[in-house]
Amino acid sequence: MGRDQRAVAGPALRRWLLLGTVTVGFLAQSVLAGVKKFDVPCGGRDCSGGCQCYPEKGGRGQPGPVGPQGYNGPPGLQGFPGLQGRKGDKGERGAPGVTGPKGDVGARGVSGFPGADGIPGHPGQGGPRGRPGYDGCNGTQGDSGPQGPPGSEGFTGPPGPQGPKGQKGEPYALPKEERDRYRGEPGEPGLVGFQGPPGRPGHVGQMGPVGAPGRPGPPGPPGPKGQQGNRGLGFYGVKGEKGDVGQPGPNGIPSDTLHPIIAPTGVTFHPDQYKGEKGSEGEPGIRGISLKGEEGIMGFPGLRGYPGLSGEKGSPGQKGSRGLDGYQGPDGPRGPKGEAGDPGPPGLPAYSPHPSLAKGARGDPGFPGAQGEPGSQGEPGDPGLPGPPGLSIGDGDQRRGLPGEMGPKGFIGDPGIPALYGGPPGPDGKRGPPGPPGLPGPPGPDGFLFGLKGAKGRAGFPGLPGSPGARGPKGWKGDAGECRCTEGDEAIKGLPGLPGPKGFAGINGEPGRKGDRGDPGQHGLPGFPGLKGVPGNIGAPGPKGAKGDSRTITTKGERGQPGVPGVPGMKGDDGSPGRDGLDGFPGLPGPPGDGIKGPPGDPGYPGIPGTKGTPGEMGPPGLGLPGLKGQRGFPGDAGLPGPPGFLGPPGPAGTPGQIDCDTDVKRAVGGDRQEAIQPGCIGGPKGLPGLPGPPGPTGAKGLRGIPGFAGADGGPGPRGLPGDAGREGFPGPPGFIGPRGSKGAVGLPGPDGSPGPIGLPGPDGPPGERGLPGEVLGAQPGPRGDAGVPGQPGLKGLPGDRGPPGFRGSQGMPGMPGLKGQPGLPGPSGQPGLYGPPGLHGFPGAPGQEGPLGLPGIPGREGLPGDRGDPGDTGAPGPVGMKGLSGDRGDAGFTGEQGHPGSPGFKGIDGMPGTPGLKGDRGSPGMDGFQGMPGLKGRPGFPGSKGEAGFFGIPGLKGLAGEPGFKGSRGDPGPPGPPPVILPGMKDIKGEKGDEGPMGLKGYLGAKGIQGMPGIPGLSGIPGLPGRPGHIKGVKGDIGVPGIPGLPGFPGVAGPPGITGFPGFIGSRGDKGAPGRAGLYGEIGATGDFGDIGDTINLPGRPGLKGERGTTGIPGLKGFFGEKGTEGDIGFPGITGVTGVQGPPGLKGQTGFPGLTGPPGSQGELGRIGLPGGKGDDGWPGAPGLPGFPGLRGIRGLHGLPGTKGFPGSPGSDIHGDPGFPGPPGERGDPGEANTLPGPVGVPGQKGDQGAPGERGPPGSPGLQGFPGITPPSNISGAPGDKGAPGIFGLKGYRGPPGPPGSAALPGSKGDTGNPGAPGTPGTKGWAGDSGPQGRPGVFGLPGEKGPRGEQGFMGNTGPTGAVGDRGPKGPKGDPGFPGAPGTVGAPGIAGIPQKIAVQPGTVGPQGRRGPPGAPGEMGPQGPPGEPGFRGAPGKAGPQGRGGVSAVPGFRGDEGPIGHQGPIGQEGAPGRPGSPGLPGMPGRSVSIGYLLVKHSQTDQEPMCPVGMNKLWSGYSLLYFEGQEKAHNQDLGLAGSCLARFSTMPFLYCNPGDVCYYASRNDKSYWLSTTAPLPMMPVAEDEIKPYISRCSVCEAPAIAIAVHSQDVSIPHCPAGWRSLWIGYSFLMHTAAGDEGGGQSLVSPGSCLEDFRATPFIECNGGRGTCHYYANKYSFWLTTIPEQSFQGSPSADTLKAGLIRTHISRCQVCMKNL
C-alpha cells in the first residue's frame, strides 16, 4: 500500500478491533447466562420467599450498546516463517534528509552553452539616407509565380474585318398594294461589263480645240552685242550659304618661288603670310596600318543606361476591385462559313413609291440564252452615213455652200494626252468666299518684335459663357447646428442672407441611387434627329415563325435605301494575295531619327545637269529702271487647236445610271486645284472601251494658236560695253526656284488675311517635357485612333546598331520559267563534288600483281563456339575482393543441444517510465523560435464604421512620374478663336516657311533620276521556278564554304592505353548483369544480317577523357573511281508556271542593298564543255580528307545474292530537322532571253564586286526600328532602367535562311558566363527486375565487347590469379570530332514577315559525281551541346570493368537459385578504344589543371560553368568535430565535396590497434538547403533534402573571390570573367564553441545564397541531423567609406534587414 492508503487504514483497523472485542465479551456473557448453578444453596433456587416457579427462558434480546475498548492482550507466540512473498511495489519517496555538510570544491566544468538571445531592444531611429548603391547584378531567375487572377475586361478592340458574303436569301412575294412602300437598297457597284459592239460611225465633229503649244524652238543665233547698259541699283544682300564644292580646276603651274600677289589697288600680298579660308573636307585617305596599342586603363563608369527590357514577371498582386465595364470588344476572328439556316419568317412588306421603277438588287450575270426567234418589225433606225457630196452645177467659185448653223455641244471628249509643257499661268481668279475657320495650328515660335505698350482698352463685352469646370473636391462635413425650439406653432422666418461667394466647381459626384419613377411629363417638342446609334448586341434567335402566305410580284421593286448596318461578320479565311496596290500618298514627315552622326561619305561624282525647273513664284517688284523697248521677237510656234468641230450623231445608248443619287453634292476645290472626293453615288467600274468608230469628216480649220514657248537660249553674244544706269524697270519674269536662303531677319507684321480654309492637322510638335501626373477621375482609355496617312520619305537615317538576326522569310512560290539565255562564257573548273554513294560491283578485272603487306585488319566478327579446352593451370591468387553486401537471411538452423549455464548477465536496462510528475516550476523564457510559415489569407473583415474627419496632412513629396497614359481620342474642334490683331507693318514681314502643303496630284513620269543611294534590303523574294538547263560554264565563283567533314577514316594503329580516369558516378540500378567472364576463343562465325534500327533515347552520354593522339597510319593507295550510281526515284512534279506576256522593258531601278541569301536553286543540266577557266583562289581548308582506299585490288569476289527487302523504317520525328550542310555551288546557267515584262521579284543574286561609289541620292525614308542590339558582356553593371512599356507578343517566325559567311572578325574577349540554368528534374529510379529461372550451364561464349556497367554484384569467391597477359596492340585512331560551331553571325537581315504559305517541294535534282576529298580544315571552336542524338543500336558487351567504389546497398532483390560454378575462362582480348569525347576547353598547358568547387545550397547537383568538365559530384562538407575539436574544410577546395554522405563519415583509432565507429559524440557539419526547418531531428531518408549538393569542376585557370564590403556587387579584375555572385561567408562556430572559417580569396567564401544558418549539424552516434541553437555563422558586413571615423554602433537586425548589411562578393576566373 501506499503511504496515504496506510494512513487511512489505521483508524479503521482500530475500530474493527474494538468492535470485535465487545462482541466476544457479549457472547461469553450470554453463554454463561444459560448454565444452571448447583453449587449454591437450594440448588440455585431462592427458598427465602416460599415456593416460586420459574418460567422458560425468553428470546434473545436486542444487542446492547458498544462497550468500552478492552485492553491489549499479551503478545502471542512467534509463528513459523511464512513463504517468501512477491516483490512489493516501489515505495513512496522518503522525506528529504538532513542537509549534508558542504562538499569539496569540484573540478572546473566545461564552458556552458551560450545563453538565449535577450529580448530585442526598441528599434533605433532611422539612419540618414545612404548614398545610392551601385547597380546590382541580375538576380537568378525566380520560379514562375502562381497563375494570377483573371484581369479586368479589356478595352474595345478595333472592328473586325468584313465577313463573307452571305447566302442569297429566300424570295418573298409582296402584294401589289404594298410594293410601293418599300424600296430596295442601292446595289453594289456592278461588275465590269462585257465589251460592247462597235458603235456606228459618228457625225462630223465640231471644230477641234486649240492645238497644244508647240515644242520650244531651237536655240536662236547669238544676239548682237548689246549696248552699254545703265548701272543698276542693288542692295547688299545677306551672305548666302556656303556653295557646293566645285569641280577640280586644272593643275596649276608648279612654282619654285613664292611670287607676291599685287592687288589692283597696288597693295602687295605675300601668300606665305596669309592663311586662306578653310578648305572643304578632303576625301578619305587610304587605310592606314595601325599597331595594336597597349591596353587602356579602366574607364570611369558610364552614364546611366537606357531603360532596360521588361523585368521578369512579378509575383501576382492582390485581387483588385472590379473594374469599370469595358467597351464592346472587337469582333472575333472570322469563323468558318456556317451551314444554311432555316428559312426565316416572312419579311415586312416591301415599299415602292413607283411600281414602274421598282428594281431589285442587281443579280449575277446570267448565262447566254438560247437563240431567240426573229423579232418584230423594228422602229426606224438612226440616220445613215452622210452621202457623198452632190454634183455642183454652178461655177467653181460658187461650189462651196454657206456655213451651216452651229451644231449642238458635243460630248465630253476623252482626256487628252499629257502636255509636254505646262501652259502659262492663268489670270488671278476672283476672290473666293471666306473659308470656314481652320483647325487650330500648332503654337508658333516666340516672336522677336516687341511693340510699344498700347493705351488701356475699353472694357470688353461680356465673354461667352465658359465650359463647366471640373467638379471640385467634396467639402468637409460641417458641425451639427443647434436646434432652437420656439414656443409658437411656427418659427419666425428670417430675412434672406447675403449671397455667398461663388464656389469652385465640384468634382464629378458618385452616381446616386436610382430615384423613384416620376410622373409622366408633358409632351415635349420634337427633337432633332439623333446620331446613328451604336449597333446593339446580337439578340438571341427567336422561335421559328410560321410559314407566310405566298404572294407573287410581277414588277421589280426599286432599289431601297441603305439598310441598317449588319452585324459584323465573322472573320473570313485569308484571301488569296491581292494585286499590288496603287502608290500611297506621301506621308507626313516622320520624326527625326535618333542615330548618331555617321562619318562623312565619299565625295559623289559630278551630277548630270538637271532639267529646267518650273517658273518660280512671282517675285517682288525689282528696283531697276524701265528698260528700253526690245526688238521684235521671232515668230511663235504653232497655236492651240481651234474650236470644237461639228456635232456628230448621237452614240449608242449608255448603261442606265444609278437611281437615288444625291444631286446636291458639290465638289469642293482643294488648295492645289484638285477635286476633293465627296460622298456621292458610287457607280460601277468603268466598262471596257468599245471599238473605235470610223473617222468622221475633217473639221474646219482651228483658230490661230497661242504663241509657243520661247526657244532655248541662244549662245551668249559678245560682251557689250557697260551701259548707263537705267530707270526703274517693269517686273521681270519669274525666276527659277533658288536654293533656300538662310533665315532672314524678322519683318514687320502683315495685314489681316482673309480667313483661310480649314488647314490640315500640323505635324507632331517636338515632344514636350514630361508633365506632372494627371489626376484620372473615372477616365477610361479611348478607342484606338485611325491609322495616320503615310508619311513622306524622311531623311536618310544614320546607321543603326547592328540588329539581331532577322526571322527567316517565308518560302516563296516558284517563279515563272525564264527564257533560254545565250550561251555564256566558259567557267572555271568546279569545286570537287561531294562523295557519291558507292558504285555497283564492277566486272571482274584481271588478277593484279601481289600487293604490299596491308594494314592490320579490323577485328573479325565473333566466331562459332570453339571446342572445350583443357583445364588451365591454377592461377596466382587474385586481389582481395571488395567488401560484400549483406547476405540474405539463411534458412532456419537445426535445434542446438542444451548449452551450459551462462555467466551472470549484465545490469538490466532501465525500467519503464514512471507516472507523470507534478507540474514543475515556470522555466526561464526560451529563445525565439524559427520564423513560422506565412498564414493563410484571412477572410475580408466587416466594413468598419465611418471615422471622423482627420486633420489636414502636410503636403506630400512630389510624386514619381506616372507611366505614360494611353493616347487619348481626338478631341472635338474647339470654339472659333478671336480674329487676329493685325498691326501696321505686319504685311511687309514674310513669315517663316509654312508647313508642307497637301498632297498634290500624281505627277507624270519624270525624267530619269540620278542614281540613288542603296535602298533598304528587300524582303526575301519568292523562289523562282526551276530555270532552264544551262550550257555554258559559269564564271569563277567565290571561295566556297568549308566542306562537310569527311567520312571516318580507317582505324589507325592502336595507341598506348590512356591514363586512369577518375572514378565514374554511381549509376542507378542497371539491368541484369552482363555474361560472366569470356570463354575460349571460337572460330570465326558467318556474317549475320543487319539488325533492326534500335529505339531512340534522348540521354546524351558523358564526355570521356581525351585520349592521347595515336600514331599516324600508313597512307593508303588511291582507290578507283566508283561507277555511276543507279538512277534515283522520280521526284514530285513541280507546279506548272503561267507563261507571262512579254511586257515593255521597265525603268532602271535603284541599286538595292544585297538581298538576303535565297535558297539554292535547282540543279541545272550539264552545260557544254567550256573553255578552261582561270585558276581559282585557294579555297578554305576543307574538312579532314577521307582515308585512302585499301591496297591493291584483291581477287575478284563473286556477285552477292540480292538482299531481302527491309522492313519500313520507323517514322521520323515530327519536327523540322536541322538545316543541312550547304550544298556545292551550282553551275551558272545560260543568260536568259530578253523579257519585256517585269518578272516577279527574283531571288537575290550572289554578292557582286564592289561597284563604283554612286552619286548621293535623296535622303531615304526613315528605316524601321531595329531590334535591340545584343548586349555585350560587361563587368560594369548598369543602373536599373525605368520600367518599359510591356511589349506585345510576337508571332513565332520561321527559321531564317543561313546568312552569308561573315567577314573574319577580330578575336573577341571571352564572354561572361551565363546565369546558371534551372536545375534539371531528377530522374526516377527504375525498378529492380525479377531474377530469371536458373539456366543450364552454357557453352563457352565468345569474347564479348564492353557492355554497360552493371550494379555491384555479390562478393564472389576468391578466384585463382590469372596469367599476366601480353600488352595489347596500339588502338586505332579515334573518330573525327563533331562539326565545329557555325561561323560568326553575318549582318542581320530585316525581320521577315512570318507567313504560312504552303509550298510543294521542287523536283529532285540528279545526283552529282563524287568529288575528291578536300584538304583537312581547321578545327572549329567548340560547338554548343547538341540535341540528344537518336538512340544508337545496342552495343556489344564490353570487357569487365574495374571494381567500383563501395556503393550504397541497393534494394534487396528476390533470392535466386544457386548456380553451378562455371569454369574459369581465359583472359579476353583487349577492347577497342572508345570514341573521342567532345573537345574540352583549351588548357594552358598539359601540366596545369585547376579545380573549382560549386555548392548549390539546394538538393540538386549544380552545373559546372560552361566549358568545364565535371569530375564528380557529391555533398557539401563544412567541417568535422572529433574529440571536441573541429577540423575545417575550405569550401573552395575539392575536399569539401564528398562523393557520399554519412552522418559519421570517419572513425577513430587508438594506439592499441583498435578503431571505433559511431561510438562517441562526434559530429559532422554540412552546408544545408532551403528546406523548411524541422521541429525535431531528422534521420535516414529525411536527411537528404537538407544536405547541399556540390560539383567539382576542372577549370582552365584559377578562380578567386573578390569582396565589396558593400551591398553592391564588386567587379572582376580586368581580364577576368565572372563565375557567380554571392555573399561573403567568413566563419562559423557550433557545439563547444568550435568551428572554422574560409579564406577570403577562396571561392568558398562567396556563397550564392545567404542564410542566417547556412549549415546543419549531424550527430554521428545517433545518425540524426538538426539545426541546434548554438550554431552561429559569421559574414563580412558592409562598411561605410569613412572607415576610421567613429566607433561601430551596436545594432540588431531582424529578418527583413539582414541582407542590407551583408557584404557582396563575386567569384572570378582569369580569361585565357
Curated annotation (Swiss-Prot):
Start and end residues of each Collagen IV NC1 domain: 1489-1712
Amino acid composition bias (Low complexity), ranges on this chain: 68-84, 140-153, 628-640, 698-710, 721-730, 769-778, 813-823, 831-844, 1302-1328, 1400-1421
One GO MF term: extracellular matrix structural constituent conferring tensile strength
GO cellular-component term (any): collagen type IV trimer
Region ranges (Disordered): 60-237, 302-448, 507-640, 690-906, 1157-1480
Phenotypic consequence of residue 1150 to K: Risk factor for ICH; results in a significantly decreased extracellular-to-intracellular ratio of COL4A2 and COL4A1 proteins, indicating interference with the proper secretion of both these proteins
Disulfide pairings: 1504-1593, 1537-1590, 1549-1555, 1612-1708, 1646-1705, 1658-1665
Entry's Gene Ontology BP terms: angiogenesis; cellular response to transforming growth factor beta stimulus; collagen-activated tyrosine kinase receptor signaling pathway; DNA-templated transcription; endodermal cell differentiation; extracellular matrix organization; negative regulation of angiogenesis; response to activity
Signal peptide location: 1-25
Propeptide: 26-183
Glycosylation sites recorded in the entry for this protein: 138
Subcellular location: Secreted, Extracellular space, Extracellular matrix, Basement membrane
Stretch list, region Triple-helical region: 184-1484
Pfam families noted in UniProt: C4 (PF01413), Collagen (PF01391)
UniProt keyword terms in alphabetical order: Angiogenesis, Basement membrane, Bromination, Collagen, Disease variant, Disulfide bond, Extracellular matrix, Glycoprotein, Hydroxylation, Repeat, Secreted, Signal
Pro residues compositional bias, start-end: 215-224, 433-445, 752-766
Effect of residue 1690 to T: Risk factor for ICH; results in a significantly decreased extracellular-to-intracellular ratio of COL4A2 and COL4A1 proteins, indicating interference with the proper secretion of both these proteins
Comp. bias regions, Gly residues: 121-130, 711-720
Domain notes: Alpha chains of type IV collagen have a non-collagenous domain (NC1) at their C-terminus, frequent interruptions of the G-X-Y repeats in the long central triple-helical domain (which may cause flexibility in the triple helix), and a short N-terminal triple-helical 7S domain.
Assigned protein family: Belongs to the type IV collagen family.
Binding partners and assembly: There are six type IV collagen isoforms, alpha 1(IV)-alpha 6(IV), each of which can form a triple helix structure with 2 other chains to generate type IV collagen network. Interacts with EFEMP2.
Associated pathology: Brain small vessel disease 2: An autosomal dominant cerebrovascular disorder with variable manifestations reflecting the location and severity of the vascular defect. BSVD2 features include intracranial hemorrage, fluid-filled cysts or cavities within the cerebral hemispheres, delayed psychomotor development, hemiplegia, spasticity and seizures.
Reported function: Type IV collagen is the major structural component of glomerular basement membranes (GBM), forming a 'chicken-wire' meshwork together with laminins, proteoglycans and entactin/nidogen.
Protein name from the UniProt record: Collagen alpha-2(IV) chain
Species assigned in the record: Homo sapiens
Gene name as annotated: COL4A2
